[in-house]
Regions:
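Accessory recognition modules or surfaces
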Residues: 1-6, 98-111, 121-122, 153-166
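Extracytoplasmic/secreted proteins, especially bacterial periplasmic and envelope-associated proteins
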Residues: 3, 7-10, 14, 39, ...
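Primarily recognizes the serine-hydrolase "nucleophile elbow" in alpha/beta-hydrolase
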Residues: 10-76, 92
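Short glycine/serine/threonine/alanine-rich loop segments
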Residues: 24, 106, 140
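Hydrophobic anchor at the start of a short beta-strand
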Residues: 29, 108, 142
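Mature catalytic domains of secreted/periplasmic carbohydrate-active enzymes
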Residues: 36, 56-65, 72-85, 89-91, ...
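The feature captures the conserved acid-bearing segment of alpha/beta-hydrolase catalytic domains
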Residues: 54-61, 67-75, 89-129, 133, ...
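C-terminal catalytic histidine-bearing segment of alpha/beta-hydrolase fold enzymes
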Residues: 129-132, 136-169
Length: 169
């Protein structure tokens, strides 16, 4: 039904089932994702649409790097650049991550840059700031880092103001 969420759940299931072999703690795992993947990871953090629906343990934390909170604002750009089909409309545009936040949501480390042109194109205030606000309102443990001169697609941020964010998380 939702291939990206199914992929995340299969990965979590595989890793937790092989926890001893991989030397990981299956009861306290984190999901790290960037950009649109950050939205997918965020939806996975919702019990109804994510981890519980797919019968895997709840994430111990979500690390969301410059996530897309509200894809509906991206629709004009995606329509212009890509062949947007019904599947994408159903699984991306219908989810606004901040609307899925609830008090039992996993703890979140959220970061993004003020110079992120993609987030600006998609309505900057409706992305990271809106997600942070929802986390705050629902009392979800979280940390937000906003970097001045950081754009989109920089991964772990080597050579940027965001360098070291992964250690901070």
């Amino acid at each position: 039904d939702n291939a990206p969420l199914e992929d995340v759940s299969r990965a979590v299931r595989y890793i937790t089932e092989h926890a001893e072999q991989f030397h990981v703690q299956p009861e306290d795992y984190a999901v790290l994702a960037y950009s649109s993947g950050g939205q997918i990871a965020g939806v996975f953090g919702d019990a109804e649409k994510g981890w519980q629906k797919y019968n895997v343990p709840k994430p111990g934390a979500l690390l969301l790097a410059y996530p897309i909170n509200n894809f509906s604002l991206a629709k004009p750009a995606y329509t212009a650049l890509l062949d947007v089909d019904d599947w994408m409309q159903k699984h991306y545009y219908d989810y606004t991550l901040s609307k899925l936040i609830a008090p039992d949501y996993p703890p979140v480390f959220l970061w993004y840059g003020k110079s992120d042109r993609i987030l600006k194109l998609f309505g900057f205030d409706q992305q990271g700031p809106a997600l942070q606000s929802a986390l705050e309102i629902d009392g979800v443990p979280h940390e937000e880092k906003v970097y001045e001169d950081v754009g989109h697609g920089i991964g772990i941020g080597l050579g940027t103001d965001a360098e070291g964010w992964l250690n901070a998380a």
